[in-house]
Amino acid sequence: SITEELIREIYNIVPKESQINALIQARYKSFVNVVKLSSDVLQLLKRVNKRYRLGLVSNYPCSRSIQHSLMKLGLSDILEAVVISGDVGYVKPHAKPFKAILNLLSLRPKECVYVGDNWLADVQGAKRMGMYSILIEQYTPYESFDPVSGDHNPDATIKNLNELEELLLR
């Protein structure tokens, strides 16, 4: 498993399967308990979902944690496709997670608007694929990254998700 490989590589030990399972279970529980979503954001996504098909690409390694959290938060019903980097074997900005979501939705890159909060993982990955990208600066301001030649700028930048509806539904 990826977890076992990481433990072996980082700590130079070979864990027992029971230890790996205990670690995965602890991480799973902590993730599911920490993830929150305001009712305002859920309602916003439901309104956006009336006009757009929604999918999710996550750099999280554990699919089970994400799926459980999506159900708990009420997002499973509005997300048509979910891609978890742990399942794909690559993290954003690598092309594979983006290609996977495009395949699941049967869409071409130009037909997609990718919304993310990480300039490197989300904006660079989406733009390299040819998607329109929107950067949410609520958590990590664009200025905190150090772009180099060949990097892409987001097509639009918003301060928080409340601005997304205005941008997408106008």
Where are these regions (language model features)?
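A metal-dependent, Asp-based hydrolase signature
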Residues: S1-A26
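Alpha-helix C-capping/helix-to-loop hinge sites
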Residues: E9-I10, S30, S85
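Short, acidic loop-to-helix structural element flanking the phosphoryl-transfer center
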Residues: E17, A26-L54, A95
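Asp-based, Mg2+/Mn2+-dependent phosphohydrolase catalytic module
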Residues: L42, K46, V57-R170
